[in-house]
Amino acid sequence: MKDFSVQHYTFRPLSNEIGMVSMLEKLAAMGYTGAELCCFGGFESLKMTAKELKGYMDDLGLQLVGNHFTREMFQGSHEQAFAYIAEAGGKYAIYNIWGSYNTPADVAEKAEYLNGLAAIAAKAGITLLYHNHAAEFVQMDGKLVIDRLDEVLDPTIGFEHDVFFARQQGCNVYEYLRKHDRRVKTVHLKQLSEDGENVDLPDGVIDMAEVIRSAPYATDYIVEQSSFPVSILNSLEKNADYLKQI
């Protein structure tokens, strides 16, 4: 595998320490070809303009996938935030909604919110993606919440499928990816151990090569990790080496 990205959430503690530019240099040296930002509420924490970010990433041969937002933490103008992504060379505004989905009406209300954002994203020239956690793989009146969302979300909205949370809830992630094939635009490669922990990519129960084969229409495959057996850098290097071999 030649092209793979990494989620900012994975390395944010380290980038906060050494600076984003130095972090991007390390990622490029390891073989990553892209990054997905995780500025939940906006881009002030980056301390650089969109043009500056694009320049740094271009110089390093890195592609900006987009940025991950949360409904609960975002403040300010979606128009400005989405314009930043577009100017920095990104393709996607990725959203998740924390918490549970309690009723079909709750699903419909949240879908309406996301559909409104999709229209704003389209005006900026980017695409809205929906990122799952565990709550979307719970049954609601005989149907998974994610399938209910699939029915009511605007067809322009893509899915960013996080295989860790889906598998944690008992979902066959390969079948899911094939079922929603063209809607799955990006995949979070986050590994699950037999005892339910987040581990390095080579060391868990999810067959990442099969994940990639099951999502042929995805534009980006993105490493995400929140627990590190040795260190962030060690896991980043180990994961990159693993992906180069599959």
Regions found by a protein language model. Give the residues of each.
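A structural signal for alpha-helical segments
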Residues: 22, 45-48, 105, 109, ...
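Active-site-proximal loop/turn and secondary-structure-junction residues that shape catalytic pockets
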Residues: 10-12, 39-41, 70-73, 97-101, ...
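N-terminal pre-domain/capping segments
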Residues: 1-88
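Conserved beta-strand positions in the central sheet of alpha/beta enzyme cores
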Residues: 36, 66, 94, 129, ...
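Active-site acidic/histidine proton-transfer and metal-coordination neighborhood
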Residues: 25, 59, 63, 72-158, ...
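Histidine-acidic metal/acid-base catalytic patches
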Residues: 1-30, 84-89, 140-161, 166-246
